[in-house]
Amino acid sequence: MPRTAGIMNFPDFRGFTRGLILWNVGVYFLLLLLGVVAAPLAHSILNFAALVPAFFLHGYLWQVITYCFIHTGILGTALEMLTLWFLGSFLESHHGPRWLAELFFTSVIGAGLAAVALGLFARGDGYALFAITGCFGGIFGLLVAFGVLYGDLEFMLFPFPMTMKAKYLVIVYMLISLAMLFSSNRIYAFAELGGALVGYLYIKAAPRRGYAFAMSEGYFGLRNGYYRWKRRRAAKKFEVYMRKQNRDVYFDKEGRYTGSEKDPNDRKWMN
């Protein structure tokens, strides 16, 4: 896809992006309310939904997705939602909601598995019991997609009066995450880089309309191929039977009946 140039403004608030943001904000305020009126319940939900590598390895497999809906700080949540609005709506307007949903959740899962891997191989640092929250993994996948597909697009860096191309912004974020690998928050940095890598692999390897569309097309292709095979098989059996009756019948290569006087390449008369 060609790179585009221009100054990026905030896109529309709609579609899958709007639904995703509303879910995140709704869950955040629900947990905030429960923390006041039913703190034990809020704590139980956090243990159930936040990604804890040790819990994941003991069967809490859903946490590799649910952690992206759990947020614990108002400032971090606001920044993530603004970034998700900016990147998600823009990409959704160009590629559709299905493609965006696949990219986002694939990146979320990739980031979660990266965090689990670090927790597994760095048990001595206590990361196996570290609770991971936030949709940063999906955002990093969107960020990489934005930088790769629209690298020359420029936008204002609020609140600074300057513009930056998307590809340079992606490089800056990747360098920050690499630097954070040497800090106490390295599990978040490792997860961010995992989400970015999986997002990059998705936009390079996934079909143009996404995996769901490709799987649907593949299923119907296999089903139709099976029906054609059955029709050809039945046609051959019928030809053998009619020859035993000293009669000739004609079928095309797809098993459709044709008359002896018809042109087999003329499909208008086929039954």
Where is each model-derived feature located?
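Central hydrophobic cores of alpha-helical transmembrane segments
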Residues: 105-107, 160-165, 169-174, 195
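Alpha-helical transmembrane bundle and helix-membrane interface signal
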Residues: 93, 149-162, 208-212
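N-terminal TM1-TM2 helical hairpin plus the immediately adjacent luminal interfacial "cap"
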Residues: 11-132, 181-194, 203-204
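C-terminal transmembrane module of polytopic alpha-helical membrane proteins
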Residues: 1-15, 25, 176-271
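Structural signal for the C-terminal ends of transmembrane alpha-helices
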Residues: 2, 33-34, 147-153, 201-207
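Hydrophobic alpha-helical segments of integral membrane proteins
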Residues: 61-69, 91, 157-161, 214-222
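Membrane-interface micro-motifs in multi-pass membrane enzymes
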Residues: 128-151, 166
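Hydrophobic, membrane-inserted alpha-helices
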Residues: 82-86, 154-156, 171-180
